[in-house]
Amino acid sequence: MKAAVFAYSRLGCKTAERAAGYFSGYQLRMFAPQRVKQGHFSLLPPHDPDFYGQQFAWADVLLFVGSCGIAVRQIAPHVRDKRTDPAVLVMDETAAFVVPLLSGHIGGANRLAAGLAAFMGAVPVVTTATDIHGRFSVDAWAAQKGYSIGDMAAAKKVSAAILEGDVSFCSEFLIRGTLPGGVVLRNSGPVGIYVGVHTAEPFETTLRIIPPVLHLGVGCRRGISAQAIQEAVEQLLAENGLDKRAIGMVGSIQRKADEAGLLEYCKKNHFPVSFYTEQELLAVPGSFTSSEFVRSVTGVDNVCERAAMVGASRLLVRKTAKNGVTAALAAEEMEVTFG
């Protein structure tokens, strides 16, 4: 995690240095004007129009020790999307208040403001409606769990509905514990939240929350292109009604560790990839679609299904083949919790 801290006065610098302790596990940048900077501070350039944009793009958290007005003016040209914008906090130079200014839920600014306020002995000033009314914040929950939000427009409608009453909630996975305020278990209704890897929409307005619990196992012909792999996987997902964002990792046999097309596909889609030895794949328990030809070439009767099942609990989609690519999908064991 990366944090950038800005201070504008001598007292602000002292307060920022105290606040730096809260970000001790972060890559930390601290900036102040020449007239007040000291210690660990770098120069805050007075006439660089790209400076704040560069920090906005680099950091996960921006902390302005000063006024909200300063922060708003500096970040305004760079605000793009609540799914990707960093958390922006403002703390006054006396450390009396901490305000989460941007990305309160998905970026974690509300949580960070509460933590920083406790660390500094300050008061967190949280203004998001679900928080002040003690209702379920689905986008904050999804971000905390590392789940994808299917559609931000639906998320906005769900959040508005939660403020007016309870919304429906259903899941492909076992739900453990008590549901938070604002949601009730129902499989139908005008507005609802669906947690799963499929593209189902059980409600009139469905917010799909997608956990990355699918393992994609891949086997392929030597020299296969990334585009061919992309097309094979997209077809596999479409035919089985599965969401690509549910893929959490890709696996294959060790001899494919230098397969340029496979590596390019994984890089393009930001999928972590693991390669397994023949012995590791043969040790995977289960019943697989056996091929004597594949065994004669690789020493393993099935690469894609076995690779998909490493670390997973159930084989969801068996081996499919398209244009020199074989692929299978397996799912991890998962429970939905709210703690």
Regions found by a protein language model. Name each.
Residues 48-50:
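A short, well-structured juxtamembrane/interface segment
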Residues 11-28, 32-36, 42-46, 55-57, ...:
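Conserved mixed alpha/beta catalytic, RNA-binding, or beta-rich assembly cores of soluble enzyme
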Residues 16, 307-308:
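Long alpha-helical scaffolds
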Residues 1-5:
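Extreme N-terminal starter segment of soluble prokaryotic enzymes
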Residues 7-9:
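Glycine-rich adenosine-cofactor-binding loop
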